[in-house]
Amino acid sequence: AGPIQWSVIHGDPETGVTTMLMAEGLDTGDMLLTLKTPIGEEETYGELHDRLMHIGAQALSQTVAGLADGTITPVKQDGRLATYAPMLDKKIAELDFTRPARELHNLIRGLSPWPVALTHLDGKLLKVHKAAVAEGYSGEPGTLLDSKRMIVACGEGALEFLTVQLEGAKRMDASVFLPGRRLEVGHRLG
């Protein structure tokens, strides 16, 4: 499962770490301590993962101290509020440009650094490691809207690809990638 990735993909505004007692079911034990943190609008799964690693260490330290001094009381979970993150499937990595730009931006962030969002350019696989929502653009979904910046139309709005990797090539900034490709406005991706 990929709970951190799904939080980013769904555009959740915050996430966190909870310590809990062990129980027979998966993540069903009584909760001990929860530390929440906002998810940045540009933050990737990898960046959030690394932040949560440190927050998790703090939570564990605070939990041990709280149990030792009696300031933490276990709280039963409400099973009706429980959510489970399904396993990630590489099939979700394919960018569907008929979807809104914000959704695709969240998908790209949630799949970076693995498994990485992708599309096709001239029959070759193009991985999209980083992107941003491009304001003030619209057009036929999947078409290039700017020949100097890699801005691609979506079902609602547009995305600017910032870091890409063409099949068989190294990862690079789109500003370095584009000049060697000579792509024209209207060029189709997907």
Protein language model regions, located:
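Short clusters of hydrophobic/aromatic residues that line enzyme substrate/ligand-binding pockets
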Residues: L26, M31, I72, Y84, ...
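Alpha-helix boundary/capping detector
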Residues: T34-L35, Y45-L48, A57, P86, ...
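An anion-binding loop in the catalytic cleft
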Residues: I92, F97-G190
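Short secondary-structure boundary/capping segments
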Residues: I9, A23, Y84-M87, L118, ...
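Short gly/pro-enriched beta-turn/loop segments at secondary-structure junctions
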Residues: I55, L60, Q77-T83, L88-I92, ...
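Donor/substrate-binding cores of folate-linked one-carbon enzymes
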Residues: A1-Y84
